[in-house]
Amino acid sequence: MAGNVQEKQLRWYNIALMSFITVWGFGNVVNNYANQGLVVVFSWVFIFALYFTPYALIVGQLGSTFKDGRGGVSTWIKHTMGPGLAYLAAWTYWVVHIPYLAQKPQAILIALGWAMKGDGSLIKEYSVVALQGLTLVLFIFFMWVASRGMKSLKIVGSVAGIAMFVMSLLYVAMAVTAPAITEVHIATTNITWETFIPHIDFTYITTISMLVFAVGGAEKISPYVNQTRNPGKEFPKGMLCLAVMVAVCAILGSLAMGMMFDSRNIPDDLMTNGQYYAFQKLGEYYSMGNTLMVIYAIANTLGQVAALVFSIDAPLKVLLGDADSKYIPASLCRTNASGTPVNGYFLTLVLVAILIMLPTLGIGDTNNLYKWLLNLNSVVMPLRYLWVFVAFIAVVRLAQKYKPEYVFIRNKPLAMTVGIWCFAFTAFACLTGIFPKMEAFTAEWTFQLALNVATPFVLVGLGLIFPLLARKANSK
């Protein structure tokens, strides 16, 4: 009994802070401001009230329901809908990281360029083909690093991540107070209530996927539900606190961006270089030169490297670590002496290499290439969130079978409605997000659209092939 009490020592504020570091990042503010300008303030309020808060609390219930499961979403699906769909959920969780892995080396080069040169000119020195070739070489190098299992890199990444988190909060505090402390002039003039009201048209709708992408990932919090003291009360309190913290940072951060960058005339490369522009301007406000920007760029470089190495290895081992031989061929699970899934790494390399080099056939600008990969992530990555809501709907449907310590909504029809709403909204965001955010019907727009449509179908569709290969191998 004493041991059980000892294990449940997390309080609501511990949950809120741990979750905040997991879910939030300064890039979320910059990317969505680049898409919407100050209108994003309204969008954040909508997303937090009607999507993120129920999403986080749904994760809380699922984590409490399957407290002994280690596979996360795939465990939830396996218990509620069977091993076949559980495999597909695990496959989706892994394969949506492929565009993320393809984009990370480029983000590392951008951060490194700002740290070394103090501007964003490094990637502009290369043609698109040369840049992507360098990106591929960088990815292969870090794949080798991942195969070596360098624990010290994860420690460096954790320190860098905390530093970026602290600097993101520092940015909000220093930028919002700058007009009162310094003589800085606000870039966006004549701000009224109408400045924040969106014009609901097709262009606005296509940017919703980036908002969903920004607030996703709450399922990583689920293992902590049953380590929380009085989870029925403290966990939802922690999640509500998380929603408030993220909302405050998103709204104040967006207002701070509006002070620095004219909402009606947003720089074309803000999505690519906006984080560094922001800290550079902040340094100018407080007569600190490039000091803040360089510190952030170094921290971001180290954080991006650690995130890349972790994302090469961890999701793949989740997929293959508890693989069912009926769905995944044994050859794909083969490991070497150091425990690295060799064929799994090779499959990752092939898919990432294709996604790195294929865009060079139709995207001729490094800035557009970066924005395309980021937008592709906003379409593909939320596909894994769909399985969270599928699992929740299944748990609600089987309410008599499960008795979790924490229940989000006890009214069954209302709970089902919320689950369906979150699923439908995520699917809608993914579908509308496939349309490129640029002049329509040009050759490059058509090329990007084709890639945006084909990529999720091909990546998820590959998961349907492996059970056939496994069946063939097993029959022999």
Language model regions located:
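Membrane-interface "cap" regions at the ends of multi-pass membrane proteins
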Residues: 1-42, 46, 52-60, 68, ...
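TM-loop-TM module centered on a large, flexible mid-protein loop between adjacent transmembrane helices
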Residues: 75-76, 82, 238-309, 328-377
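Helix-loop-helix junctions that connect adjacent transmembrane segments
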Residues: 8, 42, 125-130, 155-294, ...
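Membrane-helix boundary/coupling elements in multi-pass transport proteins
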Residues: 92-108, 220-224, 287-330, 385-392
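C-terminal membrane-solvent junction of multi-pass transporters and transport-like membrane proteins
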Residues: 6-7, 335-336, 385-435, 447-448
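Helix-loop-helix connectors at the membrane interface of multi-pass transporters/channels
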Residues: 78, 106-130, 167, 227-231, ...
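Hydrophobic transmembrane alpha-helices that form the core helical bundles
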Residues: 54-61, 69-135, 304-315, 375, ...
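Transmembrane alpha-helical segments of multi-pass small-molecule transport proteins
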Residues: 12-19, 117-151, 165-173, 211-215, ...
